[in-house]
From Swiss-Prot:
InterPro entries: aa-tRNA-synth_II/BPL/LPL (IPR045864), Ala-tRNA-lgiase_IIc (IPR002318), Ala-tRNA-ligase_IIc_anticod-bd (IPR018162), Ala-tRNA-synth_IIc_core (IPR018165), Ala-tRNA-synth_IIc_N (IPR018164), Ala-tRNA_ligase (IPR050058), Ala_tRNA_ligase_euk/bac (IPR023033), DHHA1_dom (IPR003156). GO terms for molecular function: alanine-tRNA ligase activity; aminoacyl-tRNA deacylase activity; ATP binding; tRNA binding; zinc ion binding. The keyword Flavoprotein does not apply. Catalyzes the attachment of alanine to tRNA(Ala) in a two-step reaction: alanine is first activated by ATP to form Ala-AMP and then transferred to the acceptor end of tRNA(Ala). Also edits incorrectly charged Ser-tRNA(Ala) and Gly-tRNA(Ala) via its editing domain. PANTHER family: ALANINE--TRNA LIGASE, CYTOPLASMIC, ALANYL-TRNA SYNTHETASE. It catalyses: tRNA(Ala) + L-alanine + ATP = L-alanyl-tRNA(Ala) + AMP + diphosphate. This is Alanine--tRNA ligase. The gene is alaS. Belongs to the class-II aminoacyl-tRNA synthetase family. It is found in: Cytoplasm. It comes from the Bacteria.
Length: 873
């Protein structure tokens, strides 16, 4: 019985028993923030079980896609090494919400297993909770299971109700006993019945768990019977498929065998029992469905778990000799197996492939380098030894190796990892990052005076500003002398302190015979402004009165960019959609840099529309208005609160053009003051986050003039009017392509000539097979594959290996005619030579490619081919 039939029969059986078939919910739980991923069938019904949600049915059945990787439920490290661990699995379940209870739940389960699935009754064992006499009697007296195959399990986990057969949603809440059904694989497999000392063996395998929620547990541990007890059951599709298909390992069922075969196809591996193929087959399921449900590879949360799974799969592909992107090519094979049951997978297959390919390409750049570092480090660690934490951290921080990936490799080499050392290295980096943060100059200053009164909204110059504190090298002092760097705190200031993405002001603090150049303004603490800079003249003391003067030109450029950011944010939401939310910003005199939530690059048309909308607001020359009001009133009035910002009870609301946002920054008086708005770049900075950089005013004018000058220069070089540049460039490109084609044909002729010479002069016959191994000079490495194909045809039966080197890199191509691949495989041949020249290789049995870097070792490696082939023919 195929896996798809097993799933279908399960759902149809319970539908015939009055159950509503409920589609699988997302792998990202929508109702439980404590869960990283959906890990069982009951998750989507949690609020129904607790009474918070009512549904139009009291009986339900589902096939729930589930993930156990990361967080409390993490099977990742075991996947590929055991018969039943998976990152992704399907949980078949039936549920009763105050409808039927133990009798029907047990009767339904037994009928499905023995009548529909036709499992031999003598192969089925059951367990019940020690005190659940009701379930015991149903199994023994009504179903007729022999008592020797019914096992009572007590509190076997060290506390009251702590048992394999007692389920609890949490420390408090719904709970109750459960009964589990086991399948006996027979005496040929080691293991004992559940509850016995040998229960960890593989002979008796749990296939179905029936949970009876019949109590409410309070904080004191008291159990109160529920007025409407419920049923929650779960049976892993992969486990029951293994039983019904007569195999012992989940990886031997039809669904996995198709995926394993596909993984072997993409990696060029012949041994379908290789554990790495199991890892890849498992991981393509988890990765694909996580992407379907909106998870994108990133460096935090669910996205990082996905990234870890992808990179673990890629490492196993690399272990099999596959150095090129391959994982994404398994998506169509997965759709063929599971697309009918889960149409959302088929609908998003292209998107899934794109995300996986992008992640493969990103990690592929560092995987090989990281593996070399790890190989060198492991060569110095004996079996049973410890890989140091600094190497672990370097692989994690520089090469993107998740720690569990490195641990996976170390386990294969029988080496432990120094997690304490890794955590210490990680903490050192955190300390360094904190020290280098944006409050680097102000952090740690001890200030206990009054807050600074900010006057910079209305004026850029303030007389009578009194010095309330001075700091040199982080230490409070009474005076500062000329030539010293210092932080000055004033009772009032026109200087804006860095906040909300807007940089701090610069300028001067002056008095008679005294001049302090302010290089930056940062907050020492909430409401206290620190003016950071250099005392150029005089002696500055606490209590001095100064004239504070902001650099007006720099401030004007900054406020133009800040106000333009508000208009751009609003325009982005109009053009791209209401999902656009700010994820970060930097506003300085040169530009505005704006990060926002969006999952695709902006098109040229979208960028042009945003520019047009913003510049229309600029031309309207509307006045900006700032008001202070209660936060709740501001939000009710339509003001946008920004991601990551913290607001007090009272906020400042800025209306500028068609935008209304909460903002404490400084802005233009009218939109016309912005002058001109131009987007100069757009790109991605993280999964689901795009970045736009834009300029305004005189900076935008200079940029336009520079772009025009570049166009004029290009027109001069190509001898074409600016308006005709696209056509002229297309002509030049066509000419270049034609010349490249001529060059390629010439190289092919040279290569063919060189190949003919090799066939005549260098091929030797070994046991009736022509063997040719040679280094080709003055030949483009890209031409090697064609040469190998030609030589195979010319010499067949033949085994050919050609090498070329350029710029310190060796290219290897091996080919074996089809009639010889049973004895000699091209992938093995290329791998043999590549290993001697400091590289790796692999591919199909008839054609393989590889490379290396040790050019000096190449002649000896080529010379060794004949003996290697002779041993195998």
């Amino acid at each position: 019985m195929k896996s798809s039939e097993i799933r279908q029969k399960f759902l149809q059986f319970f539908q015939s028993k009055g159950h509503s078939i409920v589609p699988s919910s997302s792998l990202v739980p929508g109702n439980d923030p404590t869960l990283l991923f959906t890990n069982s069938g009951m998750v989507q019904f949690k609020d129904v079980f607790t009474g918070k949600e009512k549904r139009p049915y009291t009986r339900a059945t589902s096939s729930q896609r589930s993930v156990r990787a990361g967080g409390k439920h993490n099977d990742l490290e075991n996947v590929g090494y055991t018969a039943r661990h998976h990152t992704f699995f399907e949980m078949l379940g039936n549920f009763s919400f105050g409808d039927y209870f133990k009798q029907d739940a047990i009767r339904f389960a037994w009928e499905l297993l023995t009548t529909v699935y036709k499992l031999p009754v003598e192969k089925l064992w059951v367990t019940v909770y020690q005190e659940d006499d009701e379930a015991y009697d149903i199994w023994a007296k009504e179903v007729g299971v022999p008592t020797e195959r019914i096992i009572r399990i007590g509190d076997n986990k060290g506390a009251r109700y702590a048992s394999d057969n007692f389920w609890q949603m949490g420390d408090t809440g719904p709970c109750g006993p459960c009964t589990e059904i086991f399948y006996d694989h027979g005496p040929d497999i080691w293991g004992g019945p559940p509850g016995s000392p040998e229960e960890d063996g593989d002979r008796y395998i749990e296939i179905w768990n029936l949970v009876f929620m019949q109590f409410e547990r309070d904080a004191a541990g008291n159990m109160t019977p529920l007025p409407k007890p419920c049923v929650d059951t779960g049976m892993g599709l992969e486990r029951i498929a293994a039983v019904l298909q007569g195999v012992h390992s989940n990886y031997e069922i039809d669904l996995f065998q198709k995926l394993i075969t596909a993984a072997a196809r993409e990696t060029g591996v012949q041994d379908l029992h290789d554990n790495s193929l199991k890892v890849i087959a498992d991981h393509i399921r988890a990765c694909s469905f996580l992407i379907v449900d909106g998870v994108i590879p990133s460096n935090e949360g669910r996205g990082y778990v996905l990234r870890r799974i992808v990179r673990r799969a890629l490492r196993h592909g690399y272990k099999l000799g596959q150095t090129k992107p391959f994982f994404y090519r398994l998506v169509p094979d997965l759709v063929a197996q599971m697309g009918e049951a889960y149409p959302e997978l088929a609908n998003m297959a292209e998107r899934v492939g794109q995300v996986l390919k992008q992640e493969e390409e990103r990690f592929g750049e560092t995987l090989e380098h990281g593996m070399k570092i790890l190989d060198v480090a492991l060569a110095q660690v004996p079996k049973g030894g410890l890989l140091d934490g600094n190497t672990l951290f370097t692989l994690y921080d520089t090469y993107g190796f998740p720690v569990d990936l490195t641990a996976d490799i170390c386990r294969e080499r029988e080496v432990e990892i120094d997690m304490a050392g890794f955590e210490a290295a990680m903490e050192r980096q955190r300390d360094q990052a904190r020290a280098a943060g944006k409050f680097k100059m102000a952090e740690g200053l001890n200030y206990e005076g009054a807050q600074t009164r900010f006057e910079g909204y209305e004026q850029l110059e303030l007389s009578g500003a009194k010095v309330t504190a001075l700091y040199v090298d982080g230490t409070q002092t009474d005076q500062v002398r000329a030539g010293q760097q210092a932080v000055v705190v004033l009772d009032a200031t026109p200087f804006y302190a860095e906040s909300g993405g807007q940089v701090g002001d610069t300028g001067l603090l002056v008095a008679d015979g005294l001049r302090f150049a302010v290089a930056d303004t940062l907050k020492v603490q909430a409401g206290v402004f620190g003016h950071h800079g250099l005392l150029e003249e005089g002696v500055l003391k606490v209590g001095d009165t100064l004239l504070a003067r902001v650099d007006a030109v720099r401030r004007a450029r900054t406020v133009r960019n800040h106000s333009a950011t508000h208009l751009m944010h609003k325009a982005l939401r109009e053009v791209l959609g209401a999902h656009v939310q700010q994820r970060g910003s930097l506003v300085d005199p040169d530009k505005t840099r704006f990060d926002f939530a969006h999952d695709a690059p902006m098109t040229a048309e979208q960028i042009a529309r945003v520019e047009a909308i913003v510049n229309a607001e600029v031309l309207a020359n509307q006045a900006a208005q700032a008001r202070v009001m209660a936060y709740d009133d501001a939000v009710k009035g339509g003001a946008m609160a920004l991601f990551g910002e913290k607001y007090g009870d009272t906020v400042r609301v800025l209306d500028i053009g068609f935008s209304r946002e909460l903002c404490g920054g400084t802005h233009v008086s009218r939109t016309g003051d912005i002058g001109l708005f131009k987007i100069v770049s757009e790109g991605g900075v993280a999964a689901g986050v795009r970045r736009v950089e834009a300029i305004t005013g005189d900076n935008a004018l200079v940029w336009v003039q520079e772009q025009n000058a570049l166009l004029q220069r290009a027109a001069g070089v190509l001898r074409s009017p600016v308006a005709e540049l696209p056509e002229r460039i297309a002509q030049v490109q066509d000419q270049v392509k034609a010349l490249e084609k001529d060059l390629e044909q010439a190289r092919a002729k040279l290569a063919a000539s060189a190949g003919n010479d090799l066939a005549d002069k260098s091929a030797v016959e070994i046991k009736g097979v022509k063997v040719l191994a040679a280094v080709i000079n003055d030949v483009d490495p890209k031409a090697l594959r064609g040469m190998v194909d030609n030589l195979k045809d010319k010499l067949k039966p033949a085994i050919v290996l050609l090498a070329a080197s350029a710029d310190g890199k060796i290219s290897l191509v091996g080919g074996v005619t089809a009639d010889q691949t049973a004895k000699v495989k091209a992938g093995d041949l290329v791998g043999f030579v590549a290993a001697q020249v400091g590289g790796k290789g692999g591919g199909r049995p008839d054609m393989a490619m590889g490379g290396g870097t040790d050019v000096a070792a190449l002649p000896a490696a080529i010379a060794s081919v004949q003996d290697w082939v002779n041993e195998r023919l």
